[in-house]
Amino acid sequence: MKSLHIKICGLTSLVDARAAVAAGADAIGLVFYAPSPRAVSVAQARAIALGIGPFTVATGLFVDADPGFVQSVLAEVPLQLLQFHGSESRAYCESFQRPYMKAIRMRPELDVVAAMAEYPSASAILLDAYRPGVPGGTGETFDWGRVPQHTSRPLVLAGGLAPENVANAISATRVYGVDVSGGVESAPGVKDHEKIHRFITCALQASAQLNSKGD
């Protein structure tokens, strides 16, 4: 198993973003979806992305956004990765000519492998819990046994992760990365720095244990 990658999503302040980076986050997520309590303005996002340093991946999360809006964000905010969390097509995702991660919501009847195959150009696939009408950030987990075990695609696990369960999640799924938002907050959009530290510590310990077993 390769080294685990950790993304802290839904950041709304530079203070919280820097705390995530200091704790060991590989990536931070900026939400450009107005209905979300974690949504940021372009100005907020620009300040955060410019303030986290060059070695942390600034990720922009969009949900079925108008292409013109995405382009306007890209013109102002130095994003290294786009995350599409709606029903975007492969052609849409590829149209921005940027690395992208496609979120797949784990509906009960979903053929996960087939859904992943629809986005062969994605840099990673994010698997998130499903709740009708809610594109993400539900705070709910899903059956980790549904995560494909034999794939060359980088898989990122999301959905209800927290310091208390991330180690079990990693042990069960052996994913490329984990993505957390609500599980490290004191209120929607307000990160708890101690929870971030615990989450990352627990995640890295679980990953190290798997690596020590030669998996």
UniProtKB/Swiss-Prot annotation:
Protein name listed in UniProt: N-(5'-phosphoribosyl)anthranilate isomerase
Pathway annotation from the record: Amino-acid biosynthesis; L-tryptophan biosynthesis; L-tryptophan from chorismate: step 3/5
Family: Belongs to the TrpF family.
Name of the coding gene: trpF
UniProt-listed Gene3D superfamilies: Aldolase class I (3.20.20.70)
Catalytic reactions of this protein: N-(5-phospho-beta-D-ribosyl)anthranilate = 1-(2-carboxyphenylamino)-1-deoxy-D-ribulose 5-phosphate
Keyword Membrane listed: no
Record EC number: 5.3.1.24
Top-level lineage group: Bacteria
Keywords: Amino-acid biosynthesis, Aromatic amino acid biosynthesis, Isomerase, Tryptophan biosynthesis
InterPro entries: Aldolase_TIM (IPR013785), PRAI_dom (IPR001240), RibuloseP-bd_barrel (IPR011060), TrpF_fam (IPR044643)
SS bonds (residue pairs): none
Source species of the chain: Cellvibrio japonicus (strain Ueda107)
